[in-house]
Regions:
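Gly-Asp-aromatic-enriched flexible segments
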Residues: 27-185
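Bacterial N-terminal signal peptides that target proteins for export
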Residues: 2-11
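C-terminal motif of bacterial Sec signal peptides marking the signal peptidase cleavage site
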Residues: 20-22
Length: 185
């Protein structure tokens, strides 16, 4: 009896919560525009300011499938995941990650956004094909001379950035960086 009386209310509340959450959940665009603000032309660059506390930073930069890009990272403030500010080699955290060994409980490794990438690794993806386009900086080729990463995208869509962490725990992340993206061809 009680179940029948509250079922319509619960259904309405669940639907409303899903719609409202869809505005902010990574990769879900129920009420928003999925078109990026700009697409880079050949040899054109764009800079964005990235905070590690953002679980899904939509850059408004459109990537074109089959095109090659260069990604340069300049860290402005020290990166930290809660109390972890150094990797296993006692070096300051950067876009490259830290090992699961530094987590207080090893099982937490199963909760990070991408289990095939390390903690706090800078991740990139495109909005229209989030699974196929998901890459960590460890997947990209690194050019020591220019201190930048190169990659080719396999689909078109808006560039989204985040560090590999547990969803819901981005608020304890600290740090910022300038991300420069250049389309090479």
């Amino acid at each position: 009896m009680i179940f029948n009386r509250y079922l319509p209310r619960m259904t309405c509340m669940m639907t409303l919560a899903t719609l409202l959450a869809g505005c902010k959940l990574p990769g879900i665009h129920l009420l928003g525009d999925d078109e990026p603000a700009m697409t880079l032309a050949g040899d054109e660059s764009q800079n964005v300011f990235f905070f590690t506390s953002d679980s899904s930073f939509e850059t408004d930069i459109g990537l074109v499938g089959g095109s090659e890009y260069r990604l340069s990272i300049t860290i402005f403030s020290n990166w930290a995941d809660s109390y972890i500010a150094e990797n296993e080699n006692q070096e300051a955290l950067n876009e490259r990650e830290f090992s699961n060994k530094l987590m207080p409980v090893a099982l937490l490794g199963a909760t990070r956004s991408s289990r095939s990438h390390q903690w706090f690794e800078l991740m990139i993806r495109q909005s229209r094909c989030p699974r196929e386009s998901l890459l960590g900086v460890s997947d990209l080729s690194y050019d020591e001379d220019s201190r930048s990463y190169r990659f080719t995208v396999n689909c078109s869509g808006e560039l989204t950035l985040y560090v590999n962490d547990t969803f819901g725990f981005y608020g304890n992340n600290m740090g910022a960086a300038n991300i420069a993206l250049t389309r090479l061809n």
